[in-house]
Design a protein with these regions (language model features):
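Cytosolic regulatory regions of ion transport systems
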Residues: 1-245
């Protein structure tokens, strides 16, 4: 009724301007409302996404570039770009928002962005997301997809399996053939990767527990592999926690 009332023709000279703030979950909502927007309407619709706001807050508090070395933008092209690898465990609402936002915010000079999403329903989710954003999910650099999916339960995929030497089957969207392709990938995460992880598997306790396990695995990798100093690289792991307990 409120929406209907606000769309009645206002009296001349006293047209009210009403702003409606609505929460939403569907990432397509903004495009839908933009498409039906009419000129000279007395109402203004402002969409709010709790999921999007929370991911933005995380990336404002701990930006993606916090895991990188200082970037010298005066060098063009950069002789050896840094490898920013974003891990997303769980491809629900929060996980996919983290994936999309990381894709937008991870576009920095002198940086090679690599996003790996782990979920038991990876193929179905990738097909859905690629239909919405084919250019995003079909992007590749030197033949390497920017976004890849691993179809597995997150706890069963340790960082050892995702690092060079641990072969897993990865999925990516083939933009040319407009289909999802699978590849036996021996290095979803390279040894020189600067790691930033989101853990969004649903349950707060599970997210926290897996984040701690992931931190130990990454730390052990630095010790065992003789990789660059853990304290200098400072990987970032962001578990999704809703409970205040």
């Amino acid at each position: 009724d409120m929406l209907e009332a606000t769309h009645k023709d206002p009296q001349a000279g006293c047209a009210p301007k009403i702003t409606l703030h609505c929460t939403h979950k569907n990432p397509d909502d903004a495009q839908i409302f933009d498409a039906i927007k009419a000129d000279n309407e007395p109402t203004c619709l402002h969409l709010l996404s709790r999921v999007q706001d929370e991911i933005y807050d995380v990336l404002e508090e701990a930006p993606l570039y916090s895991v990188l070395e200082p970037i010298d933008i005066s060098v063009d092209p950069n002789p050896k770009p840094q490898n920013l690898t974003v891990l997303v465990f769980g491809a629900g609402d929060f996980g996919m928002q983290a994936t999309r936002t990381s894709f937008w915010m991870g576009r920095m000079p002198g940086v090679r962005l690599n996003i790996v999403v782990v979920d038991p329903n990876a193929r179905t989710i990738l097909e859905r997301e690629a239909a919405r954003y084919p250019e995003m999910f079909g992007e590749s650099c030197n033949g390497m997809p920017t976004i890849r999916f691993v179809q597995a339960e997150a706890p069963s995929v340790t960082t050892d399996r995702l690092i060079a030497g641990g072969t897993v089957t990865t999925l990516h969207y083939d933009a040319q053939n407009k289909c999802v392709s699978s590849t036996a990938d021996s290095a979803p995460i390279t040894d020189d990767a600067r790691l930033y992880a989101f853990v969004t598997m649903g349950d707060c306790g599970q997210n926290l527990s897996y984040s701690l396990m992931l931190q130990r695995q990454i730390f052990n990798r630095f010790i065992d592999q003789g990789s660059p100093d853990y304290t200098k690289q400072q990987p970032v792991i962001c578990p999704h926690i809703e409970s205040e307990e």
